[in-house]
Each structure stands twice: as C-alpha cells, then as structure tokens.
C-alpha cells in the first residue's frame, strides 16, 4: 500500500487493510513520523510501520517499476510516484503528485510546495496525470470522455498539455498563498 501522505483521508484505512489482507505499507519517513500524532488520525488506528520510501527510490512490481519522489509541502513528506501506463500496448509516462492541496500554513511549507512544483515541472515526457483526489485533474470529465471514446482516438488521460497546465495552476495558487503567508509575518 503506497501512501502519498499521512493525512487521515489517505492513511485512515491502512491498518485495516494490513490486518485483513496482510498489506505492506510504504511512505516517507517524515510522514511515518506523523503517525505518532494522534490528532491526525481521528478515530483511525495507527498503521504498522513497514517500508520507507526515499527520493529516487524504486519498487519493482513484476516487470513494472515505480519511481518515488519526495515532493513536500502539503505535508513535509509527500510522496509522488512516476510509472508507466499502457493504452492498447503503447506506453505512456504517468505521475501521481501525492499532495496537491494547499491546506497547510507557513512560509517554509509554502516554499517547500513551490519547490516541489518546480521539480515536477522539470520532469520530461509526462503524459498522464493521476491525481490523488477525484476533484482535481478533471478525472470525472476524462472518465466521461473515455466512455465515449472512438476506436483509435487518443485516450483522454493521455494529455501532456493538461499536466503542464495543471502544474501551472497549482503554481499560481501557491504563489498567491506565499504572498498571503508573508503578509501574516
């Protein structure tokens, strides 16, 4: 079970999945440390610590390889993942940004977020955005397009320009947040 970040809505069910299915849980050290903060989990039980992801670390799943990237900001240990997806046998580079939300405080964390966006913008060849919440990345709109997809039409999730545009939107929102955070000082 790869955990993008240790907020309750992403890790709240991890212990149950561990108990019921024997799942191994992986996240960054910073976010494993967050599991010691009971307020984060509300009524959810703390997961058993298994694997720790590092920036540039990889995990092979059969012939597929996941590459991990630390992209802090949303939490100090946000884990983003790059991997290959396929459409009719054709490979496409996909990235899941593990923490796109701006629901945190402080200049330092906002700068972490800005640096993470800059890092993600530097990745070459990203064609598919796999958002970690359904309300970003136009997931439902893309699913509707997929249901109506004609034979030989481009897969609606294969959208390099959409990835770039989404990151630009996140960057603009984070820059506005930084101005607000600096004004609080």
Q: Which residues make up each language-model segment?
A:
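Active-site HxH/HxHxD metal-binding segment of metal-dependent hydrolases
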Residues: 1-58, 159-163
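C-terminal regulatory/interaction regions
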Residues: 161-185
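Metallo-beta-lactamase
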Residues: 58-60, 65-165
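Electropositive, surface-exposed helix/loop patches at the edges of structured domains
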Residues: 35-36, 40, 59-64, 68-69, ...
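Solvent-exposed, non-transmembrane amphipathic alpha-helical segments
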Residues: 28, 37, 45, 140, ...
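Short alpha-helical scaffold segments that flank and stabilize functional sites
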Residues: 16-17, 119, 177
């Amino acid at each position: 079970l790869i955990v993008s970040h240790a907020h309750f809505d992403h890790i709240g069910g991890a212990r149950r999945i561990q108990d019921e299915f024997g799942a191994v849980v992986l996240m960054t050290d910073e976010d494993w440390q967050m599991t010691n903060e009971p307020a984060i989990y509300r009524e959810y039980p703390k997961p058993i610590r298994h694997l720790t992801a590092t920036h540039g670390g990889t995990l092979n799943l059969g012939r597929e390889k996941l590459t991990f990237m630390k992209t802090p900001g949303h939490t100090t240990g946000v884990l983003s993942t790059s991997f290959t997806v396929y459409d009719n046998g054709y490979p496409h580079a996909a990235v899941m940004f593990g923490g796109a939300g701006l629901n945190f405080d402080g200049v330092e964390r906002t700068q972490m977020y800005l640096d993470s966006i800059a890092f993600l913008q530097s990745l070459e060849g990203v064609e598919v955005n796999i958002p970690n919440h359904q309300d970003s990345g136009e997931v439902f709109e893309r699913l509707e397009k997929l249901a109506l997809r004609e034979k030989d039409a481009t897969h609606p999730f294969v959208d390099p320009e959409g990835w770039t545009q989404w990151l630009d939107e996140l960057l603009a929102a984070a820059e506005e947040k930084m101005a607000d955070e600096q004004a609080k000082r």
